[in-house]
Swiss-Prot record:
Highest taxon of source: Bacteria
SUPFAM superfamilies assigned: Class II aaRS ABD-related (SSF52954), Class II aaRS and biotin synthetases (SSF55681)
Identification of the protein by name: Histidine--tRNA ligase
Organism of provenance: Leptospira interrogans serogroup Icterohaemorrhagiae serovar copenhageni (strain Fiocruz L1-130)
Entry keyword set: Aminoacyl-tRNA synthetase, ATP-binding, Cytoplasm, Ligase, Nucleotide-binding, Protein biosynthesis
Lineage: Bacteria, Pseudomonadati, Spirochaetota, Spirochaetia, Leptospirales
Summary of subunit composition and partner proteins: Homodimer.
InterPro entries for the chain: aa-tRNA-synth_II, aa-tRNA-synth_II/BPL/LPL, Anticodon-bd, Anticodon-bd_dom_sf, His-tRNA-ligase, HisRS-like_core, HisRS/HisZ
Gene Ontology biological process terms from the UniProt entry: histidyl-tRNA aminoacylation
Length: 439
């Protein structure tokens, strides 16, 4: 019996993706739109290591991440390290390490890849890329105003129409006052109820009620108050006994100024917004997709006033958000916002004859020097086969340079979509291609 070789699988690791060229075109386009938007607000790009000390995440990340989602191991130097599940702890370490040299306010952003060990599903993978936007050194609500403007501007830059998304806003001090003052819960109860509120949208109302019972002393009265809180608006929430009215006033003032800047239609006060990370201390928000087939949180963030406390005695207020590429892609697909990303703006240059190789490459060099993307064949296969390659790669325009074109100082250009072919003068060719063919 002939021995059979066991080949390795070609599938990527569970929860990760291969990015073929067409996938990279989409990813690069998404990243470029995000990058251009954030840069327009004066932010600077940074990056950090994919490996950090385990202790950094143990101290700064949420319980769920550290206990169940972290990829961690002991390195060859017997140090416990982890692959970054989020960027904020690295950001805090970097800012604290250079705090005195950084002009305030600090406006930074990054688009790192992040890892979490969790069950892959729609909008959720083990490896993803995430835009992180952070602003340090502004205590007033103007920091929230700018961050929310950026969060809104990104989707508008992608062409998202009004009504395709909502920005839901709340405040951690509002929640804390409700749990501690209104419900009169102790530390363990506060923790348990807070976690349940955070996952309320992911479980049934019956499960929510059942899981809430162990944390409440007077279930009927307290659960009724929880329902009142979750269904309240900015006017009614302030009437709940024990509520921090300063937080309500903060959101009201923020909404007023944002409305004057034209994003009031997207804004919604929603006290059910919790944000699972333990480091949020003030205003929190989430951006939701309104598509009936993808009603979920796209991204979110909030205020974290004590983030660098582990590294420095100095106080520095901060606010930021993270936007993942997986949920963004689902949003863009759901609202038909992804443009044609084919290679129509790249010239394909076949080799008409082996003797014309150098002449053809001189032409391609001329085009590239004039910022026209050009792919040149490297051998003189049958011209029909070369055209098939161009079609398969998604090219629209093919330039032909044969002996007759060299004699007459012209080129032939063919539109593979329409089938039209015509002669162009070699002189001023790059300008003609840019003007008449939008290349």
């Amino acid at each position: 019996m002939e021995n059979q070789k066991n080949f390795l699988t070609t599938a990527p690791y569970k929860g990760t993706r291969d990015f073929y060229p067409e996938d990279m075109r989409l990813r690069n386009w998404m990243f470029s739109v995000m990058r251009e938007t954030v840069l327009s607000f004066g932010y600077e790009e940074y990056d950090g290591p994919i490996l950090e000390s385990f202790d950094l995440y143990k101290a700064k990340s949420g319980e769920e991440i550290v206990e169940r989602q972290l990829y961690d191991f002991i390195d060859k130097g017997e140090r416990r390290v982890a692959i970054r599940p989020e960027m904020t702890p690295t950001l805090a370490r970097m800012v604290a390490g250079n705090l005195r040299n950084l002009p305030k306010p600090v406006r930074w952003f990054s688009i790192p890849n992040l890892w979490r060990y969790e069950q892959p599903g729609k909008g959720r993978l083990r490896e993803h890329w995430q835009l992180n936007v952070d602003l340090f050194g502004v205590d007033s609500h103007r920091a929230e105003l700018e961050i929310l403007l950026i969060a809104d501007s990104i989707l508008k830059k992608f062409g998202a129409p009004i009504g395709s998304y909502q920005i839901k806003v709340s405040h951690r001090k509002l929640l804390d006052s409700f749990l501690k003052n209104s419900l009169k819960l102790n530390g363990d109860q506060v923790h348990g109820v807070s976690k349940l509120l955070d996952k309320k949208s992911k479980i049934s109302s019956e499960a929510f009620e059942t899981e809430m019972k162990p944390f409440l002393n007077n279930f009927k009265e307290q659960f009724s108050l929880i329902e009142t809180y979750l269904n309240s608006n900015l006017e009614t929430v302030s009437k709940i006994p024990g509520i921090d009215t300063n937080s309500v006033s903060f959101i009201q003032n923020l909404f007023q100024e944002l409305g004057e800047l034209g994003i009031d239609k997207q804004l919604l006060f929603d006290p059910s917004i919790i944000r699972g990370f333990d480091y949020y201390t003030g205003c929190i928000f989430e951006v939701f997709d309104t598509n009936p087939e993808n009603r979920r949180s796209l991204y979110g963030g909030g205020r974290y006033d004590n983030l660098i406390g582990l590294f420095s005695k100095e106080q520095l207020s901060g606010i930021g958000f993270g936007l993942g590429d997986v949920t963004l892609k689902n949003f863009l697909e759901g609202h038909n916002l992804i443009p044609n990303l084919s290679r129509e703006k790249t010239i394909f240059l076949p080799i008409m004859d082996e003797s014309l190789f150098v002449d053809t490459f001189k032409l391609s060099k001329e085009l590239r020097e004039n910022e026209i993307l050009t792919e040149t064949m490297l051998d003189s296969a049958k011209i029909g086969k070369q055209i098939q390659i161009a079609e398969k790669k998604g090219y629209r325009y093919v330039l032909f340079l044969g002996e007759s074109e060299i004699r007459t100082e012209t080129v032939q250009i063919k539109d593979l979509i329409s089938g039209e072919q015509k002669s162009l003068p070699r002189k001023g060719l790059s300008d003609t291609l840019k003007k008449d063919f939008q290349l």
